[in-house]
């Protein structure tokens, strides 16, 4: 068995004296592991750092085997990311989110979204809002996507302001007002223009509301059912990314 693909390095763990088991999020083959002979060498260690984009050839006798990777660098982002605490926490959290996916299950749209996220992780004006959208995308690919297109009560797409914690569907400002204390806030940057969104740059408060929204559904549908706690990296990333939210 053999295939070639590009991938984002999620991590690597030591295997023996000279090798590593490399974990990639690939464009066409999903999250995939493989052995890299000589992965601990001086030449290969910089290539296999989390956040880097690589070209990988995977070979194995049987499709279900661990197999071996031959890896070449495409883009080295690790050096840039290491200089930013926000980026390091964001990268760790993004990797934890991708590990929620079944191994070897292709998710090409999430791979593309992860590349965009990694490219902007060092920018505090962009990265937090991108992470909220990335969490929404992970929820959708796990089968728990939110419907933010129209009001669950009226069917209208005008002035959407809330999300029902039960259905995961948007609710308009007027329809939700009597029950606002029971609903989750829908920040403006997640509302389409045709549904009343302004298109304005999200404020730290908007982003915090976004993380509250995604965090609720991740906990309800993913973390709690699997018996795992939210990643500490998420908490640290949210704290840094919304520091001015008050």
UniProtKB/Swiss-Prot annotation:
Keywords, ordered alphabetically: DNA damage, DNA recombination, DNA repair
Keyword set includes Ribosomal protein: no
Keyword hit for DNA repair: yes
Database matches in SUPFAM superfamilies: ArfGap/RecO-like zinc finger, Nucleic acid-binding proteins
InterPro entries: ARFGAP/RecO, DNA_rep/recomb_RecO_N, NA-bd_OB-fold, RecO, RecO_C
Pfam families xref list: RecO_C, RecO_N
Entry's Gene Ontology cellular component terms: bacterial nucleoid
Gene3D superfamilies the UniProt entry points to: Nucleic acid-binding proteins, Recombination protein O, C-terminal domain
BP terms from Gene Ontology: DNA recombination; double-strand break repair
Family according to the record: Belongs to the RecO family.
Function: Involved in DNA repair and RecF pathway recombination.
Official protein name in the record: DNA repair protein RecO
């Amino acid at each position: 068995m053999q295939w070639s693909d590009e991938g984002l390095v999620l991590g690597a763990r030591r295997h023996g004296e000279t090798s590593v088991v490399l974990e990639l999020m690939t464009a066409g083959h999903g999250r995939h592991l493989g052995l890299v002979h000589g992965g601990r060498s001086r030449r290969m260690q910089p290539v296999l750092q989390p956040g880097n984009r690589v070209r990988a050839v995977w070979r194995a006798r049987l499709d279900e085997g661990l197999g071996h990777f031959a890896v070449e660098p495409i883009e080295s982002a690790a050096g840039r990311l290491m200089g930013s605490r926000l980026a390091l926490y964001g990268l760790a959290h993004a990797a934890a989110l991708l590990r929620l996916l079944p191994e070897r299950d292709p998710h090409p749209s999430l791979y593309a979204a992860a590349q965009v996220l990694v490219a902007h992780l060092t920018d505090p004006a962009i990265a937090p809002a991108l992470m909220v959208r990335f969490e929404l995308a992970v929820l959708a690919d796990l089968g728990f996507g939110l419907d933010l297109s129209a009001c669950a009560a009226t069917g209208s797409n005008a002035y959407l302001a809330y999300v029902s914690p039960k259905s995961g569907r948007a609710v308009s400002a007027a329809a939700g007002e009597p029950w606002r204390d029971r609903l989750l806030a829908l920040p403006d940057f997640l509302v389409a223009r045709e549904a009343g969104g302004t298109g304005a740059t999200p404020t730290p408060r908007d982003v915090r509301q976004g993380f509250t929204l995604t965090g609720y559904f991740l906990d309800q549908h993913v973390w709690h059912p699997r018996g795992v706690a939210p990643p500490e990296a998420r908490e640290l990333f949210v704290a840094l990314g919304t520091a001015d939210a008050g």
